[in-house]
Structure formats: C-alpha cells, structure tokens
Amino acid sequence: MIKHISLDFWNTLMVSNKIFSKLRLDFLKKEFFQNISIEELSIQIETIGDESDTINMKEGISIPSEVMYQRLFSKFDLEITTTQAEKIYNDLEVLFLDNPPISIYDLDELKRYLKALRNNGYTTNISSNTAFIKGRTLKKIFNDYDLLDYFDFLIFSDEINSSKPSSKFFKELEKECKNLNVSKNSILHIGDSFEADIKGAEAFKIKSKLINIDDKKLIQLLIGLEN
C-alpha cells in the first residue's frame, strides 16, 4: 500500500525559465566572454550540462556547480578559482530567483491536491538531481512559492553528493521515509526520466511511475492516489 509520494522536480513539477537562461548568457558574455558569440556560449553551457548529467548518473556522484562553471571556462582555455566560481554562482543566483522556474501546473491546483493527499495520511517529498542550480537555491524557490509546507523533506543530489539513479540516492530516500515510519515498499517515486527515476527506483525495489511533461498527467495521478 502506497503511503509516501516522492516527486522529481525538473520537468515533473517545474521547467526552467527561458528568461533566466538568456540573462545568464548575457551576464557571462558581458563579464567574461566578450569575444565569444552568444550562440557558442549557449552551446558550451548545454554541453557542460549534458556531460555533467552523464557523469553524475553513471558514477552516482553530483558534480558541484562551481566545478561546472570551471569546466565551462576551460572550454575557452580560461581558468577560474573555486572562489571565483562561487562568486559567479552567487551573482547568477540573484537572476535565477528573480526569474524562477515555471510550474507546469497551476500552483493553487497543485497545492490543493498535495494538501488533500496529506490530509488523507500520505507523506511527500522532493527527490531531485541538481546541476548548475544548487539545492539550497531550489529551497528558496519552494519558499517563495509557498510550497515548503507541502513536503516532509527535500532531497537534492548536491547535498548528499549522489545523483539518481544511484542506489545511494534512493537509500537516502528510504532513510528519510523510515524517520516517518514509512517502509520502502510503501514509497512511490514519480518522475520524467526513465533512466534516473524509473530504473533507479526499481533497481532499489521502490515503486515508480513515469510521467511525460507534455501529457501533464501528474494532477490526474495524484487524484487517483487520493481516491
């Protein structure tokens, strides 16, 4: 019997804000890459993101955001220190918070169904891999959207140095659920990535459900659980 719902974040609940993506490019070009085209810079940011995701998922680690920015600079034969990378992150965080991720669903409707689940005895959490954006920043988004009260805990890969689909990540989920007196066989993990969310959960003997961002079926799924 399902008693706990674990939700992925990116492309399950929210998508990145294109305005932030543009402002990040503008900031980096103006401050550091004046001789690099926006197009080339965009390609390399995407490449670093893809490369990092592949490594994280294959090795079960979580490459820090600072290292990702250092690798971006190295693509153009430039070097920055960890301190400089931290400064860049902090500057970009301001832009990110001003142009936050966009909810796939109507937030009031999502909150209503999450509240109904919790009123029916379910516990809930977020289980998310991170990349350029740290968990600490995403927590600020949850606070700004008044979503924190709808989840018992949040797991972000950078905070445990482990990414889905690794068993270490899902072991953390199991541990947190045990603190709520919920056993592993009572957890349902929901996400959009077959590799990270479904295969990872199933390898750790946790039930899972794949949803497609284009279908927008999460609300229907939550209604089904409620009933």
Model-predicted segments: where are they?
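Asp-based, Mg2+/Mn2+-dependent phosphohydrolase catalytic module
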Residues: 1-7, 15-18, 33, 39-40, ...
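N-terminal helical cap/lid subdomain that shapes the substrate entry/recognition surface
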Residues: 2-106, 120
